[in-house]
Amino acid sequence: MDIQLFQGYGGKVIVAVDYGERKCGVAFGEILPQKSLVIPTKNLKEFIRKLKPDKIIFGLPLSMSGKYTQQTFKTVAVAFKFSKEYETYLCDERLTTKIGERISKRDDAVSAALIFQSFFENSSVCEKVTDPRKKVDLALEKVDGEVLLYEFPDPSLNIEAREVDVVTKNPVLAYFYSKNGYFVGRELWEKKYDLIISGKNCEELKKYLKENGRLVCL
C-alpha cells in the first residue's frame, strides 16, 4: 500500500480500525475517509507507524444487547497498547445505524470507513482511551456473601467473598478486571448484595443492598 499521498498532512491523518484477529479493516484521511482497505492484523502496527496518524479510532464491539464480549476485550487490549503512542479512541459500533447494518455484510473496509464517519458525526459514542486504574488502599475482611464492585478503579483489590460482581461502563477498566478473572457487566443486575464498593453514584446503589448490607463509597 502506497501511503506517500498522506505524507503532506502534517500529522493530521486519522485512522479508523475495525479490528479482527486475522485481518483489520482500516480507513484513513482527514475529515473524510479517503481510502479504506483490509490488511492482515499482523501488519497493523507497521501500517500505523508509517502513516503517523494524529488519532486512531477503534470500533468497540459489544453484543447487540450492550454486553461485553471476548472480542470487546481483544479490541480494547490492542487499542490500549496504541494509546501509549497515539491519541486513541473507542467508538461504540451499535450506536451508528449504518455500522449496525454492516454486521450481516461483514465488509471490513466499509466498516472501518463507517467507524471513521461516526467519530465526526456522533462523537458522544466515542471515548478517549486512557488508563482508568487507580490504586485504592482499602483493607477488607473476608465477606461471607455477595459483593458488588461498581465503577471501582482498582482491579487489583484483594477481596475474598462468595461471589463478586463487577459493573463498569469504562471498557478499559472492564478489560483489566477481565484479565484478573472477573465477569464484568455494563449494567446493574436485579439482585442485592451484602457489600457494595463504589466509585460513584452511591445514593442510587442503596436499593441494591440486602438488609444489613454495607455500602463503601470512595
Curated annotation (Swiss-Prot):
First-listed, main subcellular location of the protein, grouped into a coarse class: cytoplasm
Disulphide connectivity of cysteines: none
EC number: 3.1.-.-
GO molecular function, a single term: nuclease activity
Protein origin, superkingdom: Bacteria
GO cellular component, one term: cytoplasm
Function in brief: Could be a nuclease involved in processing of the 5'-end of pre-16S rRNA.
Protein name per UniProt: Putative pre-16S rRNA nuclease
Organism: Thermotoga maritima (strain ATCC 43589 / DSM 3109 / JCM 10099 / NBRC 100826 / MSB8)
